[in-house]
């Protein structure tokens, strides 16, 4: 089941409740065609991977959370474990990595676009 997240509080509660499980968060918008296209597959993955938590954030109704996670494109998928964004465990193609600037900057895993095969591959790798 995909949990709808509407606030920073709900987001923090989800990450806290996940413990050591992988959390996959889709940042999307109702007007986004690719978001609509990938939604059924994302829902199906939430039923297939029961040991992974799936969540969805509407970027238009959750602007504080969208800014906090530095979302610039929809759909964007971010993955978390132990309440933190997952850092790459293996080499990733440059287009799949996002670099943050400023103090403490590091490479994090962030997947943009409606490519369900790549998303599922990363879920299997990070479980």
Curated annotation (Swiss-Prot):
Q: Where is the secretion signal located?
A: none
The family annotation for this protein states:
Belongs to the thioredoxin family.
Q: Which CDD domains match?
A: TRX_family
In terms of superkingdom, the source organism counts as Eukaryota
Tell me yes or no: is Cytoplasm among this UniProt entry's keywords: yes
InterPro entries, sorted: Thioredoxin-like_sf (IPR036249), Thioredoxin_CS (IPR017937), Thioredoxin_domain (IPR013766)
PANTHER family noted in UniProt: THIOREDOXIN-LIKE PROTEIN 1
Q: Which gene encodes it?
A: Txndc8
Annotated S-S bridges: 32-35
Q: What does this protein do?
A: May be required for post-translational modifications of proteins required for acrosomal biogenesis. May act by reducing disulfide bonds within the sperm.
Location of the Thioredoxin domain: 2-127
Record localization: Cytoplasm; Golgi apparatus
* Species of the source: Rattus norvegicus
Return any one Pfam family short name: Thioredoxin
Which residue ranges does UniProt annotate as crossing the membrane?
A: none
Keywords for the protein's UniProt record, in alphabetical order: Cytoplasm, Developmental protein, Differentiation, Disulfide bond, Golgi apparatus, Redox-active center, Spermatogenesis
Q: What is this protein called?
A: Thioredoxin domain-containing protein 8
Gene Ontology annotations for the cellular component aspect, listed alphabetically: acrosomal vesicle; cytoplasm; Golgi apparatus; sperm flagellum
